[in-house]
Amino acid sequence: MSKYEEVAVHGYEEFCKAVSDRKGKEIFAYFSGDKDEHGKSWCPDCVKAEPVVRAELPHLPEGTVFIYCQVGDRPYWKDSNNDFKKTLKLTGVPTLLRYGTPQKLVEEECFKADLVRMMFTED
């Protein structure tokens, strides 16, 4: 049994529901481009970052929630009016953030295991 809960969601509404269902818990969220039927994202940086982020998951604090969110297809993501950009102020994928704080890693920063681990382990 792992010490954190992982939740996979697709799209903004599912993300919001996952967050509201876990009110009061510390939440880390990873946003990635949608995956195709072969499990490969249209976003090459997401493909590169995911194994780095996953390798650091054991460092998540006990009792936290890790939400893996697919943001949609490329045309949806590129639309500057999508809810992820408008409401969550995301600027790129992949993005790893500590929900409710200004802490986030964007794009190439997610390739760096030391930065990912620092986000998971520092208060």
Curated annotation (Swiss-Prot):
UniProt-recorded Gene Ontology molecular function terms: protein-disulfide reductase [NAD(P)H] activity
Annotated Thioredoxin domain residues: 41-123
The protein's UniProt keywords, in alphabetical order, are: Cytoplasm, Disulfide bond, Redox-active center
The record's listing under Gene3D superfamilies reads: Glutaredoxin (3.40.30.10)
Tell me where in or outside the cell this protein is found. Cytoplasm
**Pfam families of this UniProt entry?**
TXD17-like_Trx (PF06110)
Q: Which residues form the active site?
A: 43 (nucleophile), 46 (nucleophile)
Q: Identify the GO cellular component terms for this protein.
A: cytosol
What's the main place this protein lives? cytoplasm
Annotated function: Disulfide reductase. May participate in various redox reactions through the reversible oxidation of its active center dithiol to a disulfide and catalyze dithiol-disulfide exchange reactions. Has peroxidase activity and may contribute to the elimination of cellular hydrogen peroxide.
> Which family is annotated?
Belongs to the thioredoxin family.
User: What PANTHER family does its record include?
Assistant: 42-9-9 PROTEIN-RELATED (PTHR12452), THIOREDOXIN DOMAIN-CONTAINING PROTEIN 17 (PTHR12452:SF0)
What is the recorded name of this protein?
Answer: Thioredoxin domain-containing protein 17
Which species is the source of this protein? Danio rerio
